[in-house]
Amino acid sequence: MEDRIVRAISSDGMVQAAAIYSRNLTERARQIHKTLPVATAALGRALAGASMMGDALKGQGASLTLQIKGGGPLGTVLAVSDNEGNVRGYVTNPQVELPLRADGKLDVGGAVGHEGTLTVIKDLHMKEPYVGTIDLLGGEVAEDIAGYFVESEQIPTACGLGVLVDRDQSVKSAGGYLIQLMPGATEDTIVKVEGGIMAAGPVSALLEQDPDPEHLLRAVMSDFDLKILETQPVSYKCYCSRERVERALISLGRKELEEMIREQGGCQLSCQFCDTVYDFSKEDLERLLASL
């Protein structure tokens, strides 16, 4: 099944929700970055969360960056989404290995770290991007995203994210959900949301059995009459290009370029999101220098 996001609202208008199936884009990220299982799980969760958050943005060209710095061995976990839910991302240390937790699951929280911050940057093409930062709640990603919405945007939110890694280290299933209460939601609504989540069980297991994100949404919101608003295909998508890299080199300024030509002759730059390598010869750099 192709990766996609489904958005819905309850018939009484009190709950809005999204769910994503993201196995393919998570597997693509694994292949690009050569992540080991715990890094695959952490990055996969971040990509799924950022995709659902980015897809909700209004305005062509808007983007959302989700950055997690937890002080753990993975280093920074970063995911960037456009306003259609297409994502790219990386972890600083993709080769991290940790023992499984006592329950046999990957120790994502241990790899991410428990002491640090989650930052969301929304670039809506206004004068300044919106930036919201919270202290991590545990480093498991889903609860931290929910905490961000509660603390920074005052929106009561439940988030579930899961990545199931197969024996050969490929991604078996991945995805999640984001459920948010609208103003005026009652205590009864909260109880129904919490009850549905508890009854449904782990996200990765649900998606392994049935990869349809609409069915995931209906499983965790079984006590609600849902109206499906839209279905959006999503993918792992990098926007790098040689032209963008050239602009980045030009932005270094004359002095830096002259030094690069003198000391290195040329340079080789790789995209941190997709690992595409861009080679610039001495002549290429001299051409860029002449354009200044």
Segments (PLM) and residue ranges:
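Cys/His-clustered metal-coordination modules, chiefly Zn-binding fingers
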Residues: M198-L292
